Amino acid sequence: MRNKGLSFYKKKKKISQELLREIFSWIFGIALSVFLAAVVVIFLGKSTRVVGMSMEPTLENGQQIFIDRFLYVLSSPKAGDVVAFLPNGNENSHYYVKRVVAGDKVRIADGTLYVNGQESKWVTERILDAGIAENEIILGNKEYFCIGDNPNNSEDSRSANIGPVEEGDMIGKAWFHLKSGTDGIGFIK
């Protein structure tokens, strides 16, 4: 008579060949996706941090952002784009992150930014220092006037040290930000 008590030996179930193939297929698919995402980010994108408070409230000091380096190969920056650039192409500088606001002519008068004679919708705060934009600036081909969303705490195209930004000095369009302080992750508007 057999004891029906504890049994420490159980028959092992064999894993079928089909199940193994399915598992490896999923693992390969996930690994390939991660690899392709890394290639896209490394070669077409860039990551950097915002330096300073010039883009508040849109972006905060130290906030991590992702830059699309490929977009401006196919098209040109548009008014409202948030871009990263090296001022005057200075490779030793940190990336400046500012908003493109201009068309052909830019001027700041009585604290208001005018683009082609019309009040700009991108800067609503009264600008205390017009800088070089006190006199009308006529932009050349592939030149852009870039300003911080917090213009009274921003070194931007109004500064003689920076001036209009040439398209060739732009790293790309900032398109996504990570969580910082009270701000969650999301697309840059």
What are these model-predicted stretches?
Residues 93-115:
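Mid-length scaffold segments of soluble, non-membrane domains
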Residues 58, 76, 106-107, 137-140:
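Extracellular/periplasmic catalytic domains that process cell-envelope and extracellular macromolecules
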Residues 63, 78-82, 104, 143, ...:
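Structural motif
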Residues 81, 113, 161-163:
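Short Gly/aromatic-enriched secondary-structure transition segments
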Residues 1-93, 165-189:
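Protein maturation boundaries and topogenic segments
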Residues 133-189:
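Beta-strand-rich cores of mature extracytoplasmic or soluble domains
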Residues 111, 115-131:
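PP2C/PPM family metal-dependent serine/threonine protein phosphatase catalytic domain
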